[in-house]
Amino acid sequence: MNNKEHIKSVILALLVLMSVVLTYMVWNFSPDIANVDNTDSKKSETKPLTTPMTAKMDTTITPFQIIHSKNDHPEGTIATVSNVNKLTKPLKNKEVKSVEHVRRDHNLMIPDLSSDFTLFDFTYDLPLSTYLGQVLNMNAKVPNHFNFNRLVIDHDADDNIVLYAISKDRHDYVKLTTTTKNDHFLDAFAIVKKDMQPYTDIITNKDTIDRTTHVFAPSKPEKLKTYRMVFNTISVEKMNAILFDDSTIVRSSKSGVTTYNNNTGVANYNDKNEKYHYKNLSEDEASSSKMEETIPGTFDFINGHGGFLNEDFRLFSTNNQSGELTYQRFLNGYPTFNKEGANQIQVTWGEKGVFDYRRSLLRTDVVLNSEDNKSLPKLESVRSSLANNSDINFEKVTNIAIGYEMQDNPDHNHIEVQINSELVPRWYVEYDGEWYVYNDGRLE
């Protein structure tokens, strides 16, 4: 019995000693948090792609060309940032004295329009309320959800400027009588007019018969230089840090495509074409097609993390069904085109934030002038070839414009150190809602 009692006493003493040791360890435990991500500190340390909020709405939501017509003799110029600013400045912060909405069942006619007017030509349609409020800072009660893609500026009507916003289908327009004095606008126009060259107006279908609905393009384009654009690559880690709310990211890679995801979103990165595609899982129910919300929303979202890269990105297309907006890189006032989408930012808005975000991770490092001038065919040659091509329905041609083709990895003078593209001036045609390069009578 004595041995048993002795053993019990030893065991009890050991248990008491272990309890004391464990209690001391618990009270003095200090966790190692060196390798634990703190979401709040991570967000505060997240760096933007470039300096945020440097892009301006009035240089991002712009026309692609400016047309002047006097007595049915058109002339025009590309919509450089400088030209657009000069012509919109007299219109900004003015009042709208009257608004009138007119609907035409057949071809559009504007009987009150004078024979001397200027036209802003857009490649996309957008809400009139957005353009007036966000770009011109005009307060006007206009028809709900009225979209337009041409703005006619009548500077020969009485003493004040009259605006006509024309719908994309060419059957509606909204007339706005402003407090802008004609003389103020004409002073600015006189400077822009120096850059204008002869343009030709083309009728492609029954909706482009009126003088404000023609397809306009330069009659005989001037020789344009070719360029080489050298790029830097934006790191995927920087994009992930901006878009993902927490640090838990699972990576998987297959066939050159790497997938990153957590409980808030999923992103795919293709290292062959440097394309990045992010989808917000908290906004996956439905996208928003309300352009009054999506245009300012997507602009602020991209601008907020420096996503426009301090380059000339402009809104280029809007999809009223899916809600997707495409911002496109411009060079010297001309749009650039690339089959891989290396020149685009595509974004769709949800109920509260970004729903879908696709972009190239290429940032322009330097643009080199090749000193080579390229001649383009005359517009009449382009028009005639398209009209006589049996594979093309000429009635579906809605725009003809000059742009720069970004040709990846050209055979000559290839710079091996950095990704680069050669930019070559070409004719482009908007056909059935899509843009194609014109090549010897064909659309490619």
PLM regions and their residue ranges:
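Non-catalytic terminal regions of proteins
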Residues: 70-75, 349-351, 395
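Exposed beta-strand-loop-beta-strand "reactive/processing" segments of non-cytosolic proteins
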Residues: 237-276, 308-354, 358-360, 402-435
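Hydrophobic membrane-insertion alpha-helices, especially the h-region
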Residues: 8-26
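Extended, non-globular interaction scaffolds
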Residues: 423, 441-444
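Short, non-transmembrane alpha-helical segments in secretory-pathway proteins
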Residues: 83, 95, 283-322, 369-415
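Short, Lys/Arg-rich N-terminal segment immediately upstream of the first membrane anchor
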Residues: 1-7
